[in-house]
Amino acid sequence: MAGLLKKIFESGKKDVKYLERKADEIIALADETAALSDDALREKTVEFKERVQKGETLDDLLVEAFAVAREGAKRALGLYPFKVQLMGGIVLHEGNIAEMKTGEGKTLTATLPVYLNALSGEGVHVVTVNEYLAHRDAEEMGVLYNFLGLSVGLNLNALSSTEKREAYACDITYSTNNELGFDYLRDNMVVYKEEMVQRPLAFAVIDEVDSILVDEARTPLIISGEAEKSTILYVRANTFVRTLTEEEDYTVDIKTKSVQLTEDGMTKGENYFDVENLFDLENTVILHHIAQALKANYTMSLDVDYVVQDDEVLIVDQFTGRIMKGRRFSEGLHQALEAKEGVTIQNESKTMATITFQNYFRMYKKLAGMTGTAKTEEEEFRDIYNMRVIEIPTNKVIIRDDRPDLIYTTIEAKFNAVVEDIAERHAKGQPVLVGTVAIETSELISSKLKRKGIKHDVLNAKQHEREADIIKHAGERGAVVIATNMAGRGTDIKLGEGTIEAGGLAVIGTERHESRRIDNQLRGRSGRQGDPGVTQFYLSMEDELMRRFGSDNMKSMMERFGMAEDAIQSKMVSRAVESAQRRVEGNNFDSRKQVLQYDDVLRQQREVIYKQRYEVINAENSLREIIEQMIQRTVNFIVSSNASSHEPEEAWNLQGIIDYVDANLLPEGTITLEDLQNRTSEDIQNLILDKIKAAYDEKETLLPPEEFNEFEKVVLLRVVDTKWVDHIDAMDHLRDGIHLRAYGQIDPLREYQSEGFEMFEAMVSSIDEDVARYIMKAEIRQNLEREQVAKGEAINPAEGKPEAKRQPIRKDQHIGRNDPCPCGSGKKYKNCHGKEA
């Protein structure tokens, strides 16, 4: 252990030496840079950009660029970065975490690597915890960037897509972590590439990096959509399919557990739901509900595939016969079963897109962060983000007095002592900041101070504008501020007149937080830049942390010594507290690591889907190649399921293939039983694919190429988005329920990974099938736009068109039942002159 500590300490010393050497090189250019005029200094930015274009790396430019940014800060802001700030800037440029104590000027430090990395033209994101800080920093530091000829954008929640796009197009963009994550998710839901707002993620500097990448790491960002408006469609579809007759209206393929409507069944469906063509894109929702109702009623059996318990449909594992708690069938099949069995149909709001901060920020090419407290989480930053934590020395020696903890037997005794301490310090004009872990603690202390007539402010992290204002004045003579869990991070407490003589800022902690880092943050508010200050934590044996980690012996020991109301200062207790904190931190790290392992399953799937969507949206030419692969996989599956080359021909179900092709891919009768007999499985596939290719060729002639390309995009995006949202929903249910299945030797994570993979593969097959069906069977409507598809609605193209001129009927044409009637009425042939025929 000692050897390990020695190694770490020595590597830290090496880091500092290297940074000092580099900072000295920058300082050596100070006079030369100071001699440049404002215009010449600004011209340096243009020169640097050109050099990057010609192949110089940002590392090559670091010393010169930092010197220019440093001189720029002196002229534009009246601030001249110290040597330690240059060192911090180098750490950030290298994609690591600079641990800089409070008041050491982190905001100014960040301007150096931000300026350097903005020269690449790829955009730099500066990330803060709230919009107030993003706004403040963009405004204040923007003066420097603009002075040096760079553009600065501020990305806020209230902006329109156009305004956001402009903010992201700037060299430097200030934003909150939430807004960046949500914009990424929204970008992957758009249907036109012009609607995307973000550029590829290049470099981000995160302020208060521990808060965002550790404390909020487990928080998922979720965009949820309305669940199906009502469950009535499930009930209607269920009622409809129960009126159908097997063979006449539908066929069942036992092997693949699939059900197909026949032509008669389709006509009945169109009449029942009062639509012209079930395969129109505007009727996808109806067709989907019918398909699931057919499956629920005619391929799934109660007490075999599922059971009903307590008004709920529960899935039965086909291999073990166990009930799979928490698992729901996806794509509305579960709701179809609920409608079939007459139990309550559950419809939650749907998660349309989701990502955690861990996975969002790991997508940047380079990530850096700064904070006053990161050393305690060093292992986590290294393991999960591949970032090192490097301590930057302070500009001036810290002279703050950090006193040992005072420990009381009861909470009541502790709070009385806290209030007495505040009153004494207040009386001599010393400013006091009181840190609490919970809101109720701050209210309790506040009421005690009111009774003593001590004027004070209470801060809960709700109103950022007012918060910053209170924190600004917290260092004035006699000020008392009670803050919950370090509200007001990011705003410095500067000492007012006469407070140095009173001892500087006193920070009082009312209990230890479960994380040492949060305690250190509170301590760090005092003694900034060599100011005097004092910090004191008050503990009691009844505190949450002490209760959780067995302090009964200590409590009885204190009572034995008759110290029920008095405090003790004990190194032993302080050590016990610290080891309890270490244990909690370890547990929290493990839990965050586990969340990441679960989230990684969805991350890999999300990357596949988002990449596919991006390719579709960006495609300039026909997507036929992609679609034909989907059709091929679908035909391959249907043929091999019904006519496997590993089975004797007498076991083949050729009629099953014909039923599927008739219902989903080609006009009825295109392929007959005679066509398929006496062929190999491979020949059957090729025959069907040839017929589909000919039908596709014919379909392409119906529209100009750009419009047909648009039709293909509409179908692909509609199907992929619908299936993906259903899949996320199903994965949510799986994850919620997987721990309920931890029987025997089963590892829930392994189970989640393998089932999640199976579900993803099933979704991909389902996408293939639906795309094949809609491409081959949907009628092409000329003004069906992607935007309408994204909202799940499509305008009836017959509305608002000039009335078509009626044409004479020619008997010699072959007219399909779903083709437009040649008389020009705008109706389908089967609903017009087809009736008479």
From Swiss-Prot:
Biased composition (Basic residues): 827-837
Enzyme class of the recorded protein, top EC level: translocase
Stretches for region Disordered: 791-837
Amino acids binding Zn(2+): 821, 823, 832-833
Note on cofactor: May bind 1 zinc ion per subunit.
Any single Gene Ontology cellular-component annotation: cytoplasm
Record key words, sorted: ATP-binding, Cell membrane, Cytoplasm, Membrane, Metal-binding, Nucleotide-binding, Protein transport, Translocase, Translocation, Transport, Zinc
MF (Gene Ontology): ATP binding; metal ion binding; protein-exporting ATPase activity
Residues the record lists as binding ATP: 85, 103-107, 492
Assembly description: Monomer and homodimer. Part of the essential Sec protein translocation apparatus which comprises SecA, SecYEG and auxiliary proteins SecDF. Other proteins may also be involved.
PANTHER family: CHLOROPLAST PROTEIN-TRANSPORTING ATPASE, SECA INNER MEMBRANE COMPONENT OF SEC PROTEIN SECRETION SYSTEM
Protein's UniProt name: Protein translocase subunit SecA 1
The species this protein was found in: Listeria monocytogenes serovar 1/2a (strain ATCC BAA-679 / EGD-e)
Species lineage: Bacteria, Bacillati, Bacillota, Bacilli, Bacillales
Gene: secA1
